A protein has these predicted regions:
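Structured, mid-chain assembly/scaffold modules that mediate subunit interfaces
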Residues: 73-232, 435
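Surface-exposed loop-to-helix/strand elements on domain peripheries
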Residues: 101-108, 305-423, 455
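Short, Φ-rich (hydrophobic/aromatic) sequence segments
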Residues: 66-94, 132-140, 244-264, 377, ...
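Short coil/turn segments at secondary-structure boundaries
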Residues: 127-129, 151-152, 264-270, 348-352, ...
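C-terminal anchoring/interaction modules
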Residues: 2-20, 361, 376-515
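A broad, structural surface signal
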Residues: 108-119, 135-142, 146-149, 153, ...
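N-terminal-proximal low-complexity accessory segments that begin disordered
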Residues: 1-97, 508-515
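Extended, charged amphipathic alpha-helical segments
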Residues: 227-362, 403-405
């Protein structure tokens, strides 16, 4: 307190306290001060406490949406297409020789064996690698996390795939019980951690736990053999949370609102009318008796109603359905949903209205979000699986490593997935040509931008050109027989002067005529 506050506190302590309180309020942020119109909502629990309470409920709600909500199904399908794609994560081996050049012999050997193993990589033998990766991604985004055990060596009931004794055992998050927590042993939600919060081992149920987790036998799997892909928004979070958590309420409200509008439209579509009578007919004691008379009227196109009595007319029920504002309201809600799930509005809503520039701008912005999810998947699944598979294949003698290989680069590889689609292929292709000619990109980058593997494309391209030359076939797709670009450029240069001269002559004639 300053001198004035001390003096006031001696005479009126309550006044001094009020002054200090007011000074503290002035220094604080406005958002930190609760008011009648601003109700403060706080979250002071750590990530594990929050997930322990609501994680399972959110996961079950997200699964219900994936089964019953068309918008969620479409959004997750689009995530599969944009993050994993039809061919899965493409792995291009990049081992180098001691001279620093690419070891093409070893790379081709690894690539061939990897393709054979990718036909049936899981323990069930039901999925190819791209299908398994898409299921892992969908489980990760919907449930918040997914587990997969890497099984290597001789195992009863399992046959080596392409000569490599290595498999994947994918598991939903229910197999790692979240109820298993013991602070004395540093066990948090089914995962043992060391003092640095690095996972040591996982408690895994041997069968589907269902509702009776305590009755199911469990096993302990070392962390080095377990892949754990989780979606987190906070540090030091042991288990993942579904991607749909921030938008669950909005999605449920939108579904119920659409159901109500659809039901109202069905009711209004049922044509209804009524017979209106005048008051004079009702009050007249001689009015006809309608009790025994059939008043059902058969109506069809061109019908002339002759059964109406004097003083009666036909009235119809007016309907305001379907709601004219439903489309705009729905689109606004879908924009909010797309922002909450790191997706593209046009892809989720299937609304592709707009100019080329607007569509491409949205693709550019949305692609970064897909790239982040893709990078997380590669870091947690694709890279560990490839490196463990390669080590197992070398140990099993399936792959021979040449003596001139730089062993420090043995596990090097380029991982790539789906890239941003091309709205106008001609514009995109011309842009890539300019980048390559300017030295800002490579031909491999161009091939990857189309979702292909550079080595595979070059191999097939060379075989195609060699076969055409062998058969004496000439197409303009062979650059050796397409000097048209230089001819066009030369003709433009040669004709430029004539065109300019012709233009000058025409302008001179125009000026002469005007004079």
């Amino acid at each position: 307190m300053n001198f004035i506050d001390k003096a006031i506190s001696m005479m009126s302590p309550g006044w001094a306290v009020s002054r200090l309180r007011s000074r503290a309020v002035i220094k604080a942020y406005e958002a930190a001060i609760p008011t009648r119109t601003h109700k403060i909502k706080r979250e002071n629990r750590n990530a594990n406490q929050l997930n322990q309470i609501s994680g399972k409920s959110l996961r079950e709600q997200a699964r219900w949406f994936d089964n019953n909500h068309d918008l969620v199904v479409g959004a997750l399908d689009k995530m599969e297409e944009r993050v994993i794609g039809a061919k899965g994560i493409i792995v291009e081996p990049q081992p180098l020789t001691v001279a620093g050049t690419l070891n093409n012999v070893l790379a081709e050997q690894i690539r061939a064996r990897w393709a054979e193993w990718s036909v049936s990589p899981d323990v069930t033998g039901q999925y190819t690698r791209p299908v398994l990766e898409r299921l892992l991604l969908r489980t990760w985004l919907r449930d918040g996390e997914v587990f997969s055990q890497m099984v290597a060596g001789k195992m009863p009931g399992l046959e080596p795939v392409a000569g490599v004794p290595f498999w994947l055992e994918a598991m939903e998050p229910d197999y790692v019980p979240m109820e298993k927590t013991d602070s004395t042993n540093n066990l948090i939600q089914g995962i043992y951690f060391n003092d640095w919060q690095r996972p040591k081992s996982y408690i895994v149920c041997k069968s589907w736990p269902g509702f009776a987790t305590a009755m199911v036998a469990t096993k302990l799997i070392d962390a080095e053999n377990m892949l754990h892909l989780k979606f987190t928004r906070r540090l030091n979070q042991a288990r993942g949370v579904t991607l749909l958590a921030p938008v669950i309420i909005r999605l449920l409200d939108l579904k119920e609102y659409e159901d109500s509008e659809r039901l109202a439209a069905r009711i209004s579509a049922a044509f209804a009318m009524f017979i209106r009578r005048s008051d004079a007919m009702v009050q007249d004691g001689d009015a006809p008796d309608y009790a025994d008379k059939d008043r059902d009227l058969d109506i069809e196109p061109g019908t002339i109603l002759k059964d109406l009595l004097p003083g009666e007319d036909i009235g119809t029920i007016k309907s305001d359905r379907p709601n004219a504002n439903l489309e705009s309201f729905r689109m606004g809600q879908l924009r909010a949903v797309a922002a909450g799930v790191r997706g593209s509005f046009s892809s989720i809503a299937r609304n592709y209205d707009g100019t080329y520039s607007a569509q491409r701008q949205e693709l550019v912005e949305a692609q970064e979000g897909y790239a982040i999810l893709q990078d997380n998947f590669i870091a947690a699944v694709s890279r560990p699986v490839y490196r463990r598979w390669l080590a197992t294949a070398i140990t099993a003698g399936v792959i021979d490593v040449p003596p001139d290989t730089d062993m420090a680069t043995l596990f090097n590889a380029v991982y790539s997935g789906p890239v941003m689609p091309w709205i106008d292929p001609l514009k995109e292709a011309n842009a890539w040509r300019i980048l390559i000619r300017g030295g800002a990109a490579t031909e491999s980058d161009w091939v990857r931008a189309r979702g292909g593997a550079p080595a595979e494309v070059k191999r097939r391209r060379k075989a195609e050109i060699d076969e055409n030359r062998k058969l004496g076939l000439v197409f303009d797709t062979d650059p050796a027989h397409d000097p048209g670009e230089q001819d066009n450029a030369g003709s433009e240069d040669n004709s430029g002067g004539d065109k300019n001269a012709a233009g000058d002559d025409s302008r001179e004639r125009t000026r002469g005529g005007r004079q």
